[in-house]
Amino acid sequence: HSQGTFTNDYTKYQDSRRAQDFVQWLMSN
């Protein structure tokens, strides 16, 4: 991910339970 793509993805997921899964996915890659 570029910084912009990361920011957009985080914004989409931050208000969802998927935010936690998204962070874990980032950490595992």
Swiss-Prot record:
It is found in: Secreted. One of its GO terms (cellular component) is extracellular space. GO terms for molecular function: glucagon receptor binding; hormone activity. The keyword Secreted applies. The keyword Ion transport does not apply. Keywords: Hormone, Secreted. Induction: Produced in the A cells of the islets of Langerhans in response to a drop in blood sugar concentration. It comes from the Eukaryota. It holds the Pfam family Hormone_2. PROSITE patterns: GLUCAGON. InterPro entries: Glucagon (IPR015550), Glucagon_GIP_secretin_VIP (IPR000532). GO terms for biological process: adenylate cyclase-modulating G protein-coupled receptor signaling pathway; negative regulation of apoptotic process; positive regulation of insulin secretion involved in cellular response to glucose stimulus; protein kinase A signaling. Glucagon plays a key role in glucose metabolism and homeostasis. Regulates blood glucose by increasing gluconeogenesis and decreasing glycolysis. Belongs to the glucagon family. This is Glucagon. It comes from Polypterus senegalus (Senegal bichir). The gene is gcg.
